[in-house]
Amino acid sequence: MNTRVQPGGDGSAHTPAPSDDALDTNPSGVTASEPGRNGMRISRPGGRPARRPRSAPHPLRAEWLRGFAPWAGAGLLLALAWAMAAKADQWQGSWGATTELLSTAAALIGVPFALAAGSWQGGRERRRRTAELLSSTARTPLVQLLVAALPLACWLAAAHVLVVAGALAACAPYASAGGPAYTVFAGNALTLAACAVLGHTVGRAVPFRLTALPLAVGGYVVGGVIGTGRSDVRYLTFCMIHILGDNGLAVWWYPLVSALWAAGLAAAAVLALTAYRRATALLPLAAALGAAVLLVQTGDGLVRDNPLSHRQVCDTSTTPDICVNATYPGMLPEVTRALSGLTGRLEGVRNLPVRYEDLWRDPHRGEAQLPILTPIGWSAVRGKVTDPRQYAWEAAQMLVRWDCHEAPSTERIAVTDEAVLRWLAPDPLSARIREYFMKQARQEGDTKDLARLRAEDEAYERLTAMPDGERRSWLGRYFATADECSPKPSEVPSL
């Protein structure tokens, strides 16, 4: 047995030394493998297998999930959603109006927001004082810029896509013809992403806190001034697709070429700032300029007429027939219901217009203009006529000298016209206006106006008191001259 002398002792006291078995820390005989030469694994006595060190998360993951980019996406989402919700009455029920307002919101809100957000993100290295640290890493300046800029660009594009999806879902229950313009929304999303990258590049080149503000203001001013102009240069405005409701459709490649114009500028700026060979920036710049030339040269040809806007759907069971534009055929039952009182009173009357028409032209002879239903948000909201009595009154006005700029030549004809209109479409608002004028004329002692108003009341009472057959016959003679601006007094029947 081995013995060990304890220090400080006299050497006579012995302590047994631990045996080999006692030194064994792995009595079960289990061994762990460790890598050896030539890929061979050797056993390591005792202990657990060595854990591999956890790899650091990819920088893109951190940019995607934390920091400024998600908050910027949420901010743009709220801004665009608020803009659409505030004017929901003006686009729900019309694919064209929905597309137009989404494009306008993207141009006037999304583009300035993306430029400012990108600029703020691009200047963060200067604010954090980490520019020198980043320059010492193995990644190239181009990779560093893209890693920081692309997550923000994708978040902003995703915010726009979510707002578009919500708007289309809100429009679909009330729209009855046409469909969404998906290339417009795809082009606008790409343009917003390009604006974020362009703003990021400017923020890196001019890394000051106030750089974002001039970019946002400049984006808004350019979009508002140039985009609403009359020259063909307006087609260069980012995201602003120039259509007018349901009457025009953007050609399918227009939004994509517009996105190429923005993306080319962004790519040229990125390469000019970060590439080792700055001349490579000329390639995307040439693509951007080519897209710009194509947009300006094509001009109004970028928008074509909607074939549906030249057609009508009609209800031939009424007198006159009622036709609405084929871009919103679902409004026909609602319009027919709103005009049911008017058409019921005209049943059996001769010399009426054949139909109410709803095309973008002056009515032909034998037609009357249907009161306008567009733009959405005035006479019609979400597939309903907002004020049926007012709408019927407007439709009655279209039957009696609607295109005449001067009053009839004699007062008797004017009195007769007023009596007929009051009988065809009684309107509480018109009645209140008449009472106001009557009261004012009495207070001012205006005998001429009092006499005219009393004559109109008497004519209306005589027309109302007529038997139905006699009234239909009288109205037939009256409507024989109702479209003439200066009929002979002898041709207009009196009351």
Predicted regions and their residues:
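Hydrophobic alpha-helical transmembrane segments
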Residues: 1-118, 125, 268-284, 294-304, ...
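Small-residue-enriched transmembrane helix-hairpin modules in multi-pass membrane proteins
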Residues: 394-396
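Solvent-exposed, acidic/flexible segments
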Residues: 195, 332-335
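Membrane-interface helix-boundary motifs at transmembrane edges
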Residues: 134-135, 139, 143, 203-208, ...
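Amide-forming acyltransferase catalytic core, primarily the GNAT-like/NAT-type
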Residues: 249-260, 272-290
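Alpha-helical transmembrane segments of polytopic integral membrane proteins
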Residues: 112-119, 128, 163, 195, ...
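Hydrophobic alpha-helical segments
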Residues: 54-56, 61-97, 144-268
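Helix-loop-helix units of permease transmembrane domains in multi-pass membrane transporters
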Residues: 117-154
